[in-house]
């Protein structure tokens, strides 16, 4: 008797629970007629969330089909999940390059290294050259020359500001010959007295006015200087007489400190 009564109680309890869940899945409309709920998945997910068992965790919102208005970071904190989601966009592997293009790649890399090395070399040279004297300092440099050892009719060459300077001790015949030249026949007309401070001494820069070559002293058709590069002839006063040079030899700034002391610059 007791066993039969227990079976009847268990069957009635099961029917009551099934009736409860079946009724909860229906909604009553305005016409008082039962209607099927339009979202059975929402009801099942809601039933899963109200369970109190510790073994069942709440599923993330994106698995339940729910759209959350919370930011992704906040949603991840409120709904933690042990499922690891990899961001494939940050782990994308590029396809291997074409082997036929390796030569070009090596050429580009080698050229870049060469340009880099050249730039470093230029920077080092610029730094080293900046430690030398500037052009302003070199422009103020002067040179003192002793004239006592120069024989009449001879020419000596000294270096001043990186350029050769010709110093010629002229004889009386040289002075007469320089003053007897007709200025009308000169390409760059200039009297001998305008080019010297002492008629005995002629001081000129030893650079041809054509293309910058160094003329040879005591040579040429006029007894002065001859440029072997293109055949320019200068007379005993350093004036151009023949050849492609357009101007006379330059006269630098100089002065006599003593009778036999010359200061150039």
Curated annotation (Swiss-Prot):
List UniProt keywords, sorted A-Z: 2Fe-2S, Disulfide bond, Electron transport, Iron, Iron-sulfur, Membrane, Metal-binding, Mitochondrion, Mitochondrion inner membrane, Respiratory chain, Transit peptide, Translocase, Transmembrane, Transmembrane helix, Transport
Report the locations given in the UniProt record. Answer: Mitochondrion inner membrane
The molecular function terms of the Gene Ontology recorded here are: 2 iron, 2 sulfur cluster binding; metal ion binding; oxidoreductase activity; ubiquinol-cytochrome-c reductase activity
Membrane topology is: Single-pass membrane protein
Query: Which reactions appear under catalytic activity for this entry?
Result: a quinol + 2 Fe(III)-[cytochrome c](out) = a quinone + 2 Fe(II)-[cytochrome c](out) + 2 H(+)(out)
- Which domain of life does the protein's organism represent? Eukaryota
* Top-level EC class as recorded in UniProt: translocase
Q: Which residues lie on this side of the membrane: Mitochondrial matrix?
A: 54-102
What is the designated name of this protein?
Cytochrome b-c1 complex subunit Rieske, mitochondrial
- Taxonomy-wise, where does this protein's organism fall, top ranks first? Eukaryota, Viridiplantae, Streptophyta, Embryophyta, Tracheophyta
In the UniProt record, what gene is named as encoding this protein? Answer: FES1
């Amino acid at each position: 008797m007791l066993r039969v009564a227990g079976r009847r109680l268990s069957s009635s309890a099961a029917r009551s629970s099934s009736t409860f869940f079946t009724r909860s899945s229906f909604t009553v409309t305005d016409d008082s007629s039962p209607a099927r709920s339009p979202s059975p998945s929402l009801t099942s997910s809601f039933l899963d969330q109200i369970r109190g068992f510790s073994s069942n965790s709440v599923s993330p919102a994106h698995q339940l089909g729910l759209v959350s208005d919370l930011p992704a970071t906040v949603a991840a904190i409120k709904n933690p999940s042990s499922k690891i989601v990899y961001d494939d966009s940050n782990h994308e592997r590029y396809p291997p390059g074409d082997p036929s293009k390796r030569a070009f790649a090596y050429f580009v890399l080698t050229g870049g290294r060469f340009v880099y090395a050249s730039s470093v070399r230029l920077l080092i040279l610029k730094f080293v050259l900046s430690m030398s004297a500037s052009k302003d300092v070199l422009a103020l440099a002067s040179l003192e020359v002793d004239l006592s050892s120069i024989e009449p009719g001879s020419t000596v060459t000294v270096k001043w500001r990186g350029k050769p300077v010709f110093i010629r001790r002229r004889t009386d015949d040289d002075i007469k010959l320089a003053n007897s030249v007709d200025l009308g026949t000169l390409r760059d007309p200039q009297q001998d007295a305008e080019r010297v401070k002492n008629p005995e001494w002629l001081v000129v820069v030893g650079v041809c006015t054509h293309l910058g070559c160094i003329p040879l002293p005591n040579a040429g058709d006029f007894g002065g200087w001859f440029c072997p590069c293109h055949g320019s002839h200068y007379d005993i006063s350093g004036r151009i007489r023949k050849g492609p040079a357009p101007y006379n030899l330059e006269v630098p700034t100089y002065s006599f400190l003593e009778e036999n002391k010359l200061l150039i610059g």
